[in-house]
């Protein structure tokens, strides 16, 4: 018998700096739900990640005297590090600057 599928994705964190308590609260709740659904026997796919586009990022990168790409690389790796430190059970960590993500968005629009 095939397991029922369950897809979980919280809002992805905006990569304008370190995650705040709201980001952390949300990922803990999402992780709890994903773990509970797995316990219930569901085939769970839990995805999280970072949103890495926007003027705020460009301005923060400018202030830090680095490129926007360097800025989001640093912010995204810090967010991922914290989620991993908390042993979050996500299956995939996406970044909106990932080549695959950009291709899929272009297909839609």
Language-model regions, residue ranges each:
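N-terminal, positively charged nucleic-acid-binding surface of large information/translation enzymes
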Residues: 1-109
